[in-house]
Each structure stands twice: as structure tokens, then as C-alpha cells.
């Protein structure tokens, strides 16, 4: 991460899981005798059926099957942003100790914060000048269902800017490993938190 960047997001691992696992899990719940998940698609028609099922699962919000696919992210960002992300407890975190972070002159930060407020900056952004803006690094393990839930809440115009940018980057990176999941989810996202903004705002991920 360069000195000019305020955050960085990378994928550490997806555990070798691919999109084929999701329709597999869905069919297991119906008692079907399934082919090995590691095998290639049997035919184009079978692949089309899998993708159609994947789309239906998202459209009708049968989301429990997405809990079987997990991703581990490494995120670097200010502490105050990390704390917003760590409110989502259906996931696992491990964070770098503050003892590994350099010191910051609190008096200087305090005066800079007051100057920013007087200049009209929002408090939610001006607090980046306080010691809580110290950079931290953490690993975040979560399943696809939780990731989509977080994106529904944080990819909205009223979300804190850097938190929204981080979640956007997480979605972008996830699309490289689960392209159809993200594509179908974006195309159908006129539900949940997006209803409120559908008329006035464009989806940030479009």
C-alpha cells in the first residue's frame, strides 16, 4: 500500500471453492444424487442449468447455500473504519496489535481535528485526524451470504465513504472468483436497502 492510499484490500484465499459448489449444495437439499463437485461440467446444458439455478437462488433469496463458500480478505485501513466493519459478527477477524503501529502526537491531531470541524468538514470524516486514524491490518474470513448482506448495507449513498469503498473493493475482488454470483446479485438488487435509493441513485457497483 502506497503512502497516498488510505486503504488496501486483497483476497488471501477462497479455500479452493468454486461456484459449482453452490448449485451442488442446493440440489443436495432436494435429495439428488450428485456428481463429484471437483469434476468438470458434464455438458453445456448442465452448466446452463447450474447457472440458472444459481440465479434463482439469489433472486428468491435462498441464501443458506451461499454459506458454504468462504473468502479470506486482508484489509489495511484506519482503525475507525475497521471498527465499522467488525460490527458484522457472522464472520471471523484477527487484527494486528497496536503495539506494531507507530506513535502519533495526540495534541497535534486534536488541534487538526478542531480546525477541520471549523472548516465545515463532517465529524465522521474529520475523526480521521484523531489517533483512531492509525492504520491497522486484519484478516477477515466470511462466507458469501454475509458478504452480500454487508454489501447491501454498506454500498448505499449514505454509508461512510471509506467503508463503502472497501466493501466495493471486496465485491470487485470476489467477482473474479465468483463471477456469476456477483453478476446475478447486482442485476437483481432492487430489494432490501436498495429500494430506498433506487429512484434517486445509481448502484455504485454498476
Model-based region annotation:
Residues 1-206:
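Family-specific signature for flavin-dependent thymidylate synthase
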Amino acid at each position: 500500500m502506497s503512502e497516498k492510499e488510505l486503504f488496501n484490500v486483497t483476497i488471501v484465499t477462497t479455500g479452493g471453492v468454486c461456484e459449482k459448489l453452490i448449485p451442488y449444495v442446493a440440489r443436495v437439499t432436494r435429495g439428488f444424487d450428485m456428481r463429484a463437485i471437483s469434476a468438470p461440467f458434464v455438458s453445456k446444458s448442465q452448466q446452463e442449468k447450474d447457472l440458472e439455478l444459481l440465479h434463482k437462488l439469489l433472486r428468491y433469496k435462498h441464501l443458506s447455500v451461499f454459506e458454504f463458500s468462504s473468502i479470506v480478505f486482508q484489509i489495511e485501513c484506519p482503525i475507525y473504519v475497521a471498527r465499522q466493519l467488525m460490527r458484522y459478527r457472522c464472520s471471523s477477524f484477527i487484527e494486528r496489535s497496536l503495539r506494531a503501529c507507530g506513535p502519533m502526537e495526540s495534541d497535534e491531531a486534536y488541534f487538526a481535528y478542531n480546525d477541520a470541524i471549523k472548516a465545515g468538514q463532517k465529524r465522521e470524516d474529520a475523526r480521521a485526524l484523531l489517533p483512531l486514524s492509525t492504520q491497522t491490518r486484519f484478516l477477515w474470513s466470511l462466507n458469501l451470504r454475509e458478504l452480500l448482506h454487508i454489501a447491501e448495507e454498506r454500498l448505499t449513498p449514505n454509508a461512510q465513504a471509506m467503508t463503502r469503498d472497501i466493501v466495493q473493493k471486496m465485491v470487485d475482488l470476489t467477482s473474479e472468483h465468483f463471477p456469476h454470483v456477483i453478476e446475478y446479485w447486482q442485476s437483481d438488487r432492487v430489494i432490501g436497502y436498495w429500494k430506498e435509493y433506487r429512484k434517486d441513485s445509481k448502484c455504485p457497483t454498476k
